[in-house]
Amino acid sequence: MEAKEVVQRGYDLFGAGDMETFFGEIIHDNITWTFPGDEGKHPLAGVHKGKENFIANMSKIPEYWDNFMVTPQAMISEGNKVFALVKGTADGMDTMFGHYFEVENNQMKVMMTFDDTLTAFNAMKK
């Protein structure tokens, strides 16, 4: 699979709620997920290393946002690197995000999120 296809498959699985396949097949054991921001101010902020840490932090999403969904609008791919322009929605949220990936052996090994943190924060369940 091309890197762009791996990333699209990840979004498809995430959107379908097939987290077992998403985490089991798409996420590399040594993934590094960087979510810029001050840890403690935003529940997802920080550098999360390893699949277990990735799963633990991704699992926070339903705790803070009802009906959270990410839908890619466009992707640019160069070699193993992919950048996705993503529509992010949840109850009280309708915005755009940018997600950067590096793919290795048909799995996401690096993910960096450039999200509209103010809109997401304002939509969080308090």
Which positions does each model-derived feature cover?
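C-terminal and inter-domain tail/linker signature
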Residues: 1-126
